[in-house]
Amino acid sequence: MFWLLALLAYLLGSLSFAIVLSRLSGSPDPRSSGSGNAGATNMLRLAGRKLAILTLLGDLCKGLLPVLLARVAGLDLHAQAWVGICAVLGHLFPLYFRFKGGKGVATAAGMLMGLYFPAALLAIGAWLLTFYLTRTSSLAALIATPLTLPLLAWREPEALLPISVLTVMIVWRHRNNLRDLFAGRERHF
């Protein structure tokens, strides 16, 4: 059952709401416009608030849904987390879009909502505060993601390894943003 859910999670994660919505609306392809990222923040830049919100909600749901299905199927929290990571991998490397996807932040937040809601609230709150103070989405993601680790280590230790892997994946996908942050070239809102 685990492998079936992991495959379904990857396939669901591969549905890029940013790319689909940009095509349906006639907006520029987010992979080749703006920041080049197929995510909600770039959709805000390219297509406006409405499509950015729809992208965000779609990306959250594709992280949340596989975790909830894994729970209903009787998988333990550790396995649920790995199923959720498969959805994030689908977002990062979407099968349907030549393996060029987003950075996984919203999908990871949806995954966290299903695993341990207080960790998701902590991450979302940290993201919102950092973004409000800096107007920099990538910095907000890089601060918010690892903040969940101590809480999970204390409350849900069986999810710590998969969430640590998730953190590394998200930081890795933001490696160009890190270079730009240190060079003072990162985009702000």
Swiss-Prot record:
InterPro entries tied to this protein: G3P_acylTferase_PlsY
Source organism (scientific name): Pseudomonas putida (strain ATCC 700007 / DSM 6899 / JCM 31910 / BCRC 17059 / LMG 24140 / F1)
UniProt-listed Enzyme Commission number(s): 2.3.1.275
SMART domains registered for this protein in UniProt: G3P_acyltransf (SM01207)
Domain of life (superkingdom): Bacteria
Keywords from the UniProt entry: Cell inner membrane, Cell membrane, Lipid biosynthesis, Lipid metabolism, Membrane, Phospholipid biosynthesis, Phospholipid metabolism, Transferase, Transmembrane, Transmembrane helix
Catalytic activity: an acyl phosphate + sn-glycerol 3-phosphate = a 1-acyl-sn-glycero-3-phosphate + phosphate
Signal peptide: none
Name of this protein: Glycerol-3-phosphate acyltransferase
Cell compartment(s), UniProt: Cell inner membrane
Pathway: Lipid metabolism; phospholipid metabolism
Entry-linked PANTHER family: GLYCEROL-3-PHOSPHATE ACYLTRANSFERASE-RELATED, INNER MEMBRANE PROTEIN YGIH
Molecular function via GO: acyl-phosphate glycerol-3-phosphate acyltransferase activity
GO cellular component, one term: plasma membrane
Positions of transmembrane segments: 1-21, 50-70, 77-97, 111-131, 151-171
Oligomeric form and interacting partners: Probably interacts with PlsX.
Role of this protein: Catalyzes the transfer of an acyl group from acyl-phosphate (acyl-PO(4)) to glycerol-3-phosphate (G3P) to form lysophosphatidic acid (LPA). This enzyme utilizes acyl-phosphate as fatty acyl donor, but not acyl-CoA or acyl-ACP.
Keyword ATP-binding applies: no
Main location: membrane
Topology within the bilayer: Multi-pass membrane protein
GO biological process: phospholipid biosynthetic process
Family designation: Belongs to the PlsY family.
